[in-house]
Amino acid sequence: MTLGTAVSVAVALLATAAPADAFAATANTHHAAKKTASASSAKKKSVKAASEKSAKVASADAPRAKASRKRVTLASNVHGHRGAVRKVAFQPRRPTVGQAFGLHDTPDALALRSSVAYVVDQNTGEPLFDKNSHAVVPIASISKLMTSMVVLDSKAPMNEQIEVTDEDRDYEKNTGSRLSVGSVLSREDMLHIALMASENRAAAALSRYYPGGRPAFIAAMNAKAKALGMTDTHFENSTGLSSSNVSSARDLVKMVNAAYQYPMIRQFSTDRTYDVYTGKRNLVYNSTNALIRGNGSWDIGLQKTGFINEAGECLVMQATIHGRPMVMVLLDSFGKYSRFADAARLRNWLDAGGGERLTAANTANGGT
């Protein structure tokens, strides 16, 4: 899949909504239909208020159960019965770009749930596991690694105070944030929670405070990608909420290796928890990575999670396994915890010598 094709498909999927009449209710009389419509209209304000309240606690890496299917409830009077019959249906979630291209159907020896899986020896660059590493797909909040490098490359004062404004709200996906408009944090704190907790408004505010503003920031992201040789990569924003932020696993290895050279990115991305004061209240943020929050059995030097509907569940990280530093990329995984389970399967496979067997087979076949 090429870069241009991936962007086009992502835009098409975003524009295509599930059918509004996925489950139709019937009404026997015009009076019953009017009654139902009237009741629906009367509830509009309360439903809207509840929706806005729910959005405030949502995030790019929030629980997926509510986002996976849209609930549709319709009511009607049947055969003159006084009680309304309520019918409930669920509109299926639109496919990811990977699903649209059939990447989920690619078989692999470990039965991974990720459409894309790529493991590379960080020291030698040798591929140890490869599943669709050339595929160009949306990468969601993995984009924040590039965001962080551009922020640090700017050499802007890390103690400068940055205020969240209405411009930093997400009007594309309507995700919520714990950082309310008017919150003020230092550039360092914004970067910390953008990496560790995938805080979207923090990433958006960082791009707005860049010299030349947001357009200059996005240009710097793409220039950095080009300088790193990331030919399959394109960025449209600093948060990753745009499905037009795309890359391949091979390119993401280059980005992880580059980000690993920044001590602050290594530290911030692997912290388990962090407290900030917004000028209004204290907030406690936690890592979005279950492997970081777990029992400490992983030796992770850098990581970033990501999720939007078009990208599926994503994870990139640098980890040391059996004393061997590796870069692991998992994209378009299906199921909230599947990316972490896939990472565990890959580690177990490597522990059992899977990487060495693959290397030996490649050498015997004259491969690389």
Predicted regions and their residues:
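Ubiquitous "structural anchor" signal
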Residues: 12, 133, 156, 314, ...
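Domain-terminus/edge residues, biased toward the C-terminal soluble/receptor-binding domains
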Residues: 230, 234, 240, 244-368
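Secondary-structure junction/capping motif
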Residues: 2, 174, 186, 213, ...
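N-terminal secretory targeting signals
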Residues: 1-113, 352-368
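Active-site-adjacent loops and short helices of periplasmic peptidoglycan-processing enzymes
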Residues: 75-250, 254-263, 321
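Short, hinge-like loop/turn segments at secondary-structure boundaries
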Residues: 24, 180-181, 286, 346
